[in-house]
Structure formats: structure tokens, C-alpha cells
Amino acid sequence: MENMTQEERERGAKLLLDNPLFVEAFETLEKELLLSWARTNSNDVSQRESCWLATRLLERLKAHITSIVETGHMAKVL
């Protein structure tokens, strides 16, 4: 991504966040992870931690893409 301008990065990230397939994929993964966590035995700490970690990583990915859009927007404003 070194060759992309800030504007190109912002536009690409916004396209991802607005893409119905991308949104569906995130929502589906979040639901599947929650269901997987809910179905684990209370003493299956390893599986619960795996679900928790996957959920956090999914959130971080979305937050990173969102921050690219916000950074591009702020660069335009300033």
C-alpha cells in the first residue's frame, strides 16, 4: 500500500466498509463466533479464549479500516 495516496486509501477503505458482501461477512463471522462461544462448555477455557481472540481480531480489523477512512477525512479537513 506504499504506492497509494491517502485519498486512494480512504476511498478503498470506504468502498470496503460500504460493500454489502463485506458487511455481511463481518456480521456472519461475529454471529458465528458468538454462537461458537455460547455452545462451549464452561470449563473449555481454551475454546472460549479462541472465540474471544477471534472476535477481538475481527473488531481490530474493522477498526483499522475505519481509521483509514477517518484519517483521510481529517487530512481533507485540515
Predicted regions and their residues:
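Long amphipathic alpha-helical segments
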Residues: 64-78
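Short E/K-rich amphipathic alpha-helical oligomerization segments
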Residues: 27-43
